[in-house]
Structure formats: C-alpha cells, structure tokens
Regions:
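Structural microenvironment flanking redox-active thiols in thiol-disulfide oxidoreductases
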Residues: 83-128, 136-146
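A short beta-strand-turn-helix
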Residues: 46-70
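N-terminal targeting signals for export/organelle localization
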Residues: 1-51, 190
C-alpha cells in the first residue's frame, strides 16, 4: 500500500535554504476529482484518480502512479489541525501501525511565506516526518490540491492499487480511526 502526504503552498519558485524548494511544478494527468463536501456519499469514490508528477523539497521526483494502495496526505504549514496531525502520523509510523503494504505520500500545499510555521520543509524536519514517506511540494496555484478536490486541511485521499479513490477525509483524524477507515475502504474495493 502507498500513502501520499501533501503540504500546501501559495507561491512558486521560492527557495528557503540552499537546495530546498518550497514550491514545485505539478503535472496532472487525468480528470480532476470533484471538490469534497460533507455529503453522505462522496462522488469521487470508485473514480480513477489523476496521476500527479512533481518534486520534493530537494528536487527529487515524486509520482502518484497506481500499483499499490496509497494514502495521499495534503498538509498546510499554517494549519493548526495539520500541526496536530503530523506528530500523530509520525507516531503512527514509528509504532508500526500503518497498514501493511500502504504507501504514504505527503503533499505540502497552500504554502504562504507570510504565514506561521513557514517553511514547510523545516516544519516537517522538526517533526521528524518519516524519511521513507515522499513529500511533494505543490505549486503556488495549488495544482495538486485542486486536482484532488481538497476542501480543508489536513486532507486524506486513499487510492486503491488500481489508482481509484477508495476514501477521502478532511480534518484531523485520530490514527486508530484512520487505520480502521483505510482497512474498511480497501476491503470494499477488493
């Protein structure tokens, strides 16, 4: 399984430290998902998700292609809920509670140099964000967030191994609940 975590960004091309870029170009292949709402039935469930190609803070390539179940986590550095969620995700990983076979990818989005907790790269490093979880930097135009219908932060999108949306959640989620929802969603899609 794979999980993708995203962090928000608002401007392009800004460098914070030598070799670290907080914004990146994101290519989207496929149709964008509808914006998420609190409706009882999410119209994106079962829909083929777009594939994102972008880069991490140091220019490494990050792609959200099908192949393994993947959790995308969209994070904004200035979001209080995200600031509470990241340490929970770190503990979830270090305690070995992440479902076996799940890939996790973070996406930093809605990045704003004028907002608190900037830059996202330093924030995630301070929190000891798992190094094996790729982090994609969104564009200043929030290309990745828009493609996945992000409506709040943190925002979770679970993709099955075929790349179809199995679950979307907005807001802080306890990791026990997250694990349960992931397992239930993947059981429904198999």
């Amino acid at each position: 399984m794979a999980a993708i975590i995203a962090v928000a960004s608002q401007s392009g091309g800004d460098f914070v430290a030598a070799g670290v870029e907080e914004f990146g170009k994101v290519e989207v292949v496929g149709d964008s998902l509808p914006e998420f709402s609190d409706a009882a039935i999410d119209p994106a469930i079962g829909v083929m998700a777009p594939v994102l190609t972008g880069q991490g803070f140091t220019g490494n390539s990050v792609v959200t292609s099908p192949g393994a179940p993947t959790l995308l986590v969209f994070l904004a550095h200035w979001c209080g809920f995200c600031q509470r969620e990241v340490p929970l995700l770190v503990k979830w990983n270090s305690a070995g509670e992440v479902p076996v076979g799940l890939d996790v990818v973070a996406i930093t989005t809605s990045t704003d140099p004028a907002s608190p907790n900037f830059p996202p790269s330093e924030w995630l490093a301070r929190e000891k964000f798992p190094p094996l979880w790729p982090v994609m930097t969104d564009s200043g135009e929030k290309t990745a967030a828009t493609a996945f219908g992000v409506s709040g932060f943190p925002f979770f999108v679970l993709l099955d191994a075929e790349g179809k949306v199995a679950l979307r959640l907005s807001g802080g989620v306890e990791t026990g609940v997250l694990t349960e929802q992931i397992n239930q969603a993947l059981t429904r899609t198999n």
